[in-house]
Amino acid sequence: MTGTGKTVTRVDLCEAVYQKVGLSRTESSAFVELVLKEITDCLEKGETVKLSSFGSFMVRKKGQRIGRNPKTGTEVPISPRRVMVFKPSAILKQRINANGAAAPTKTD
């Protein structure tokens, strides 16, 4: 996994665990799936998941509001819902910005 702007997938994470931890590919895949499932289950229950030196995943409630259809301009009600938010830790922010370079942007 390099900083080339590539999208990292579950398969990439499983391969990294396989390479760095020494578990079999099957065990690595099961490990990654278990961690992701645990994070998902906690978020579904409305719990905050805090990973030290990485960041926090949390669920926030958004109330009902009035939005606008961009094509027609008509107002439409947007129902209340829950959204997931990720807040990076200060350590992660520092590591990302350590070189002072801007993050790569997606261009067409």
Swiss-Prot record:
Membrane-crossing ranges are: none
InterPro entries, sorted: Hist_DNA-bd, Histone-like_DNA-bd_CS, IHF-like_DNA-bd_dom_sf, IHF_alpha
Q: Does the keyword DNA-binding apply?
A: yes
Looking up Pfam families in the UniProt record yields: Bac_DNA_binding
Query: Cystine bridges: which residues?
Result: none
Keywords for the protein's UniProt record, in alphabetical order: DNA recombination, DNA-binding, Transcription, Transcription regulation, Translation regulation
Q: What GO cellular component is one of the record's annotations?
A: cytosol
A Gene Ontology biological process term: regulation of DNA-templated transcription
Gene3D superfamilies attached to this UniProt entry: IHF-like DNA-binding proteins
Q: Which PROSITE patterns does the record match to this protein?
A: HISTONE_LIKE
HAMAP family membership = IHF_alpha (MF_00380)
Q: What does this protein do?
A: This protein is one of the two subunits of integration host factor, a specific DNA-binding protein that functions in genetic recombination as well as in transcriptional and translational control.
Family recorded in the similarity comment? Belongs to the bacterial histone-like protein family.
State how it assembles.
Answer: Heterodimer of an alpha and a beta chain.
Spell out the protein name for this chain: Integration host factor subunit alpha
Starting at the broadest rank, the lineage of the source organism is: Bacteria, Pseudomonadati, Pseudomonadota, Alphaproteobacteria, Hyphomicrobiales
